[in-house]
Structures are given as C-alpha cells and as structure tokens.
Amino acid sequence: ITDAPGDFLSYTVDIVSLQLQRDDGTVVETLPVAATVDFARLVDLTEVISARQIPPGKYVAGSVTLDYASASRNIVVDDGSASGLVVNPVDGSGAALGSVVMQVQLDSGRPLVITARTAAHLAFDFDLLASNTVDTAAGTVTVNPVLVASVVPPDSKDLRVRGSLVGTDAAAGT
C-alpha cells in the first residue's frame, strides 16, 4: 500500500479487507487482520501489509475496503495552522462514511501471477489528492476514492514490513 502526495497531515483509516480475484473468478482474502494505516505518511514509503501465502494463480482484479467509522478524528488537513484542521469524512451526498470498497482491474497484459516458491509484488496506490475534496468551512472531506494498482511497486520508495523477524544469516545475506 502506498500513496500519492496530498494536502493532509494525517489520513488514518483502517484497511479491513484486501482481496484479489483470479482469472477463474476465485476471490482470495489476503489480509488476515485489519490494519490501521496513515496514508499521509506513505508518500515516500511503501508498506507491506500482508505477506500471507496466496494460492497460485493468475490474479486479474482486486479490492481494498477502508473503514472510515473510527477515522473521523484522524483525518487532518494542512490549513497553515500549527496543528492543522480535523475534518470529518463524508460521501458525495454529505453523509458520514462507514466502509468504502475500492475496486481495481489489473492491466490484462500484466496480471499478478503467483507460483510456488516465487515472490510477487503488487502495489496499490490510494491517491489522496484525487480522492478527496476538502471543505474547510464545513470541516468535512468528501471522499471519492481513486485506487491504482501495478504489479511492480515503485523502486524509489523505502519498504516497511510489519511482523516478527524469524532469523537472519549474515553469511548467506538473508
């Protein structure tokens, strides 16, 4: 998961689902537990949120489900003040947001192919600038999510992986 630049000091939401769909229609959940992510901090950082084993196959689509219900006080816009402006996320009609599902179709010429004993990388980029319209007077941010997926993540970003370190081998470089 990564993010394109935006005007937010904080944009913390829960990712409650990250699903991939194979070319035969099978849907695989890749996120074992919900993850809280601050997208404002992922502009120059890629975060691996799931290293779970994914069954072999050719994956052609995906979806990411974000939960905004607990995030209304965790979205802060840079308004020029020292602490920023806390805004409440709403949909296009002004109603408070709950869960939002973002669908993405992978490029047909570059599907995600998972095989036994090989690593594969898929980057989801949640574009904050394109996805959000801020109304500072109302203290709201209207969310219309834009998600882009690519099979090869950008090399220009640092990579952060969550989890326990099982072991290292300096001689083998692993």
Question: What are the functions of these language-model segments?
Answer:
Residues I1-T174:
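A short, solvent-exposed, low-complexity linear motif enriched for acidic/polar residues
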